A protein has these predicted regions:
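Aromatic-rich, lipid-facing transmembrane alpha helices and their immediate juxtamembrane interface loops
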Residues: 1-432
Length: 432
């Protein structure tokens, strides 16, 4: 099975549609009337598509083991559902579903009953469903297939954007979203109000928990994009420093642990701290054991996905735990999953409060142009690193430079430099 942009888009669209069909049928059967479970007007439940893509990427090399597929799918899909619920609550200050009345639930966001169902669905999709789907797509002429994918993705993106605008009343405490909504609605306010009223009534019928008048506890002060950018950079830098020192202590050598070609920044750690700041804030009252196991599960799933995605994009594995006991495909191992748990406790209890206090102290001294300059630098750094890695993969496969950009990359990011920046990178031989 060849995974690429088009096949992953097909998985995303088809499973989003099938998820919408399943949710709508179940909700209609329970309520004995038609209930559209889509958030906006399109027939999509994107949590299913997102879970399908992540499960396919992450577990494609585990297809021979039904047990690995079942438990892996259960974990990944549960994490996606939990993240989706938390993000929706953070943005809209409302819960869109609540499993508090079900046994073995986690804060009402997820429950064992549906996690087991996710495991079965994910196992069936990766083992049999994807192949069947790709065989059906193979009957379409390539040009038509590509056109259908692009049109479908365009509709999906528009559907998600319209959903954000339509439910803006739930996000009236988010000033930026409110401002965006006012700008989009200028000149067609009357039509927008009619559409909004109609769709909101449907959403409230489909997601009764979202219609609760009282806001949830997540209606706390929001982190701005500037805050998240600085958190990302701080987390990426500290993660690189910690990993470098750890390698020195355990392996006896100094080596680069950076994800980027310019500067000591670990993208994996930067993104992890940003996600933790968004999703785990307010968890200070939770017990340390609960935070620890949250970190073990979420961190392990996150690291596995990062490994699978970077291998898919760049044909390279940046870490390999095959020599460790209790590893899964060499992508994660139990010991380092425990480290994620320790990191979660440390971050929630001590790290984030300390960093937040420091950021608050220096925030008045940070000018907007400084944040803008940092954003431009990190964006250029990320794009250049991605291009350099892609060219490194092509160059080591014997591909000659195809354009001026390739020539420039070969000149400034030759094999010696790339191997110095990414000393543990291993090229994955493509099948066939």
């Amino acid at each position: 099975m060849n995974l690429n942009f088009y096949t992953l888009c097909v998985i995303y669209l088809v499973y989003s549609f099938l998820g919408w069909v399943a949710e709508t049928v179940v909700a209609t059967a329970k309520g004995r009337r038609f209930t559209n479970r889509g958030v906006a007007s399109g027939p999509f439940c994107f949590v299913y598509g997102t879970a399908g893509v992540l499960i396919t990427i992450g577990l494609n090399d585990q297809r021979a083991s039904l047990a690995a597929l079942f438990f892996g799918s259960m974990i990944y899909a549960t994490v996606v559902e939990w993240l989706t619920a938390k993000l929706l609550e953070r943005i809209h200050h409302r819960r869109w579903w609540d499993y508090s009345d079900k046994k073995f639930n986690l804060d009402g966001y997820v429950c064992l009953q549906y996690s087991l169902l996710w495991g079965l669905l994910g196992m069936a999709a990766v083992r049999w469903g994807n192949d069947l789907l790709f065989r059906l797509c193979a009957h379409l002429p390539p040009l038509l297939f590509h056109a259908v994918v692009w049109v479908g993705m365009a509709l999906a993106v528009l559907d998600q954007i319209s959903a954000m605008v339509v439910v803006s009343r739930y996000a009236n405490r988010h000033p930026r979203l409110g401002q965006l909504n006012r700008e989009l609605g200028r000149g067609s306010e009357r039509l927008r109000q009619k559409i909004t009223a109609s769709v909101e009534k449907r959403i409230q019928r489909a997601y009764p928990a979202a219609a609760r008048p009282e806001p949830t506890t997540s209606a706390e002060k929001q982190l701005s994009l500037a805050d998240l950018l600085w958190l990302f950079v701080i987390g990426a830098f500290l993660g690189d420093v910690v990993e470098t020192i750890f390698c020195r202590i355990t392996a006896g050598v100094w080596m680069s642990r950076s994800s980027l070609v310019w500067g000591p920044f670990s993208v994996v750690w930067g993104l992890a701290l940003v996600l933790a700041a968004i999703l785990l804030r307010g968890g200070e009252q939770k017990s340390e054991s609960r935070i620890f196991w949250f970190g073990v599960i979420l961190g392990g799933a996150y690291e596995y996905v990062c490994s699978a995605v970077t291998e898919l994009l760049f044909g390279t594995v940046f870490w390999d735990y095959s020599g460790f006991k209790f590893n899964l495909g060499g992508r994660i191992n139990l010991l380092y999953c425990f480290f994620w748990g320790i990191a979660a406790v440390t971050w929630i209890r001590y790290g984030y409060p300390l960093v937040a206090k420091g950021m608050k102290a220096v925030k008045r001294r940070i000018r907007p142009w400084m944040t803008a300059l940092l954003a431009v630098f990190m964006a250029v750094n990320l794009v250049t690193s991605a291009l350099a890695l892609a060219r490194y993969d092509a160059r080591t496969s014997g591909a000659a430079p195809a354009n001026a950009v390739d020539v420039l990359l070969d000149e400034h990011f030759d094999n010696a430099r790339m191997e110095r920046i990414y000393p543990n990178a291993k090229k994955v031989e493509k099948a066939g």
